[in-house]
């Protein structure tokens, strides 16, 4: 383990502010984009922790993506909770490669469908920094923003999380990922998720 790199990654994890598309499908990846010409499918269950007297809520998300270049990919998918469904899509650009960290920026959109309140959609913005602390292990920190209720009759609000996570490379075709979303706005909720990603060409 390289001490300077590990220290720099740890600082990024502590300093990264965030707001949350992560509460619907999660970030659940490092800053590296999908390899050019490759497909990816990811499945991850989520546990969202209620605030105060609120119940905890469980859900499951699935995303599929494609690497268009060595630095750019796109993903889309769904998340299902009890009485609530999210449909989401995003595009990610790998800004810095191993300098000494990997850094990416992603923008996206999501739509919420529910029988419990009004449907709405929002815009997502995610900043990621990650780095290898071993041959197969990466740690990452995310700034994940969701601007909710835009272009609708509902009140606008923003959900924000700090999102530290780990990604373990089983082999060239499989990654295991886990993260904890730390809510930093009143509208956000802490969450825990872990999942598996498969890659193929």
Segments (PLM) and residue ranges:
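Short, acidic/polar
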Residues: 58-61
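Cleavable N-terminal export/targeting peptides
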Residues: 1-31
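Outer-membrane beta-barrel transmembrane domain signature
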Residues: 25-56, 67, 84, 95, ...
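Transmembrane beta-barrel domains of bacterial outer-membrane proteins
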Residues: 63-80, 86-92
């Amino acid at each position: 383990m390289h001490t300077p790199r590990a220290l720099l990654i740890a600082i990024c994890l502590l300093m990264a502010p965030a707001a949350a598309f992560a509460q619907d499908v999660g970030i659940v990846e490092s800053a590296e984009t999908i390899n050019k010409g490759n497909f990816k499918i990811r499945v991850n269950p989520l546990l969202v922790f209620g605030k105060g007297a609120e119940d905890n809520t469980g859900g499951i998300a699935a995303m599929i993506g494609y690497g268009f270049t060595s630095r750019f990919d796109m993903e889309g998918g769904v998340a299902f909770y009890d009485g609530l469904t999210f449909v989401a899509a995003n595009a990610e650009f790998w800004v810095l490669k191993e300098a000494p960290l990997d850094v990416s920026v992603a923008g996206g959109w999501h739509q919420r469908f529910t029988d419990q309140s009004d449907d709405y959609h929002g815009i997502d913005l995610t900043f990621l920094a990650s780095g290898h602390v071993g041959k197969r292990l990466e740690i990452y920190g995310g700034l994940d923003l969701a601007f909710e209720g835009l272009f609708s009759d509902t009140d606008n609000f923003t959900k924000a999380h700090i999102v530290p996570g780990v990604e373990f490379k089983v082999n060239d075709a499989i990654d295991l990922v886990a993260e904890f979303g730390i809510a930093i706005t009143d509208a956000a909720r802490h969450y825990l998720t872990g999942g598996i990603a498969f890659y193929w060409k």
